[in-house]
Design a protein with these regions (language model features):
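Flexible, glycine-rich loop/tail regions that form catalytic "lids" or insertion modules at the edges
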Residues: 181-184, 188-357
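Structured core elements
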Residues: 34-36, 82-85, 122-126, 140-141, ...
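Catalytic alpha/beta active-site cores
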Residues: 1-87, 92-93, 111, 118-124, ...
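Short beta-alpha connecting loops at secondary-structure transitions
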Residues: 1-7, 44-47, 84-92, 126-138, ...
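Flexible glycine/proline-rich, aromatic-decorated loop/lid segments
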Residues: 30, 71-77, 114-127, 135-167, ...
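Structured ligand/cofactor/substrate-binding pocket environments in proteins
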Residues: 8-13, 52-59, 89-107, 139-148, ...
Length: 357
């Protein structure tokens, strides 16, 4: 959705998601999430925090509808759900966790009769990659610190802090250590966070929570009028919304309407944007020999497993035709089949994604 990387026909893709959920429930798989419902890539592609929350939650609710329609017990498959959001600098990011948890808990309790555990929304926060800038790039650590503070004050279950040089390249060991130090200092030294829920009762936090929740629900209504998440996907609602909001952000950044210190305000006329070329960073690339080695290894694997692979692919196609659990079959055949072979078989039996124009 955000990365524009839909591959399979939607029906096929959702059927496979249901197959995975069914496999986990039937085999009582615990302590492992079969899906991390992600809003991070939606945010990075340009969406604002409200749209990030709305599209992510609506995806999760769609999964619940589909899995329940297959007869799966929500209390059993929801224990293997996790969530993933981005935190930027806007004030709404301070409450996307509590808003998402409130909407999710009410929906699970009142609409689906789910127990207490399934009402809980376990989420990971990563600081915003697109908020990092190559101008005055050392200041990115300050932005990341504030974003991490948002996450911890909003009771995120886990946190990833980006390195300051990710604005222009792969981070170095030193910048990664500094990014980890941000978390450690906030967790171990910053006294305010010793309070379990420091924003509780705050006027601005409560106001933002109610405001963001209302706007998320409005987006739900817009998608509902288009036939739900799947109907909205067919008419590019989500993708268009993400692109429009990304364009607005870039426009405001360039006009200075959205101030970014060191980039469009309080700039140093003698300071220039930096790139990876300005640093002694060893970039690892595959040379021709390594590429040929991987290709040869792949061909050798396919040759050695040709007969079993053919049988496995045929079994997968037959399972697809009969509507059986594809994930269960894939767990058997991946020892003898490549990802490419399995993907091609799924294309042939289920079709590719075709975007409406």
């Amino acid at each position: 959705m955000g990365q524009n990387t839909l591959v399979f026909n939607l029906d096929t893709a959702l059927k496979m998601m249901g197959d995975v959920a069914e496999f986990y429930v039937d085999n009582d798989v615990r302590n492992h999430y079969f899906v991390s419902i992600s809003g991070y890539h939606i945010d990075e592609a340009g969406a604002n925090p409200i749209t990030q929350s709305a599209l992510t939650l609506s995806n999760g609710l769609t999964y619940v509808e589909l899995f329940k329609a297959r007869g799966l017990d929500a209390d059993k498959f929801l224990r293997n759900f996790s969530w993933f959001f981005s935190n930027g600098m806007d004030p709404e990011y301070a409450v996307i966790g509590r808003v998402s948890r409130r909407i999710w808990a009410i929906a699970m309790r009142d609409l689906y009769g789910v127990g207490e555990r399934g009402q809980k929304l376990k989420y990971h926060i990563q600081s915003s990659g697109r908020s990092l800038h190559s101008q005055e790039f050392t200041w990115n650590d300050y932005r990341t610190t504030l974003q991490a503070l948002y996450a911890l004050a909003d009771n995120a279950n886990s946190l990833h802090t980006n390195s300051r040089d990710e604005a222009f390249g792969t981070p170095t060991e030193d910048t990664v250590r500094d990014a980890v130090a941000i978390q450690l200092i906030l967790a171990k030294e910053y006294g305010w966070l010793r309070n379990e829920n420091p924003l509780q009762g705050s006027f601005i936090a409560e106001f933002l929570t109610n405001e963001v929740e209302e706007r998320v629900l409005r987006i739900f209504e817009e998608m509902h009028s288009r036939g739900g998440v799947l109907g909205a996907l067919e008419v590019n609602y989500q993708r268009n919304r993400i692109q429009d909001e990304g364009m607005i952000y870039e426009h405001r950044k360039h006009t200075g309407e959205t101030p970014i210190v060191g980039v469009n305000t309080f700039t140093d006329p003698e300071s220039e944007s930096v790139s990876a070329d300005d640093f002694d960073i060893e970039v690892t690339r595959s040379d021709v020999t390594e590429k040929k080695m991987v290709i040869a290894r792949n061909e050798k694997f396919k040759t050695e497993n040709a007969k079993k692979a053919e049988e496995g692919i045929q079994k997968l196609k037959e399972a697809a035709r009969r509507g059986e659990n594809l994930f269960e079959v894939m767990m058997e055949i991946v020892e003898h089949c490549t990802v490419g072979q399995v993907t091609q078989a799924l294309f042939e039996s289920g079709g590719k994604f075709r975007r409406n124009m």
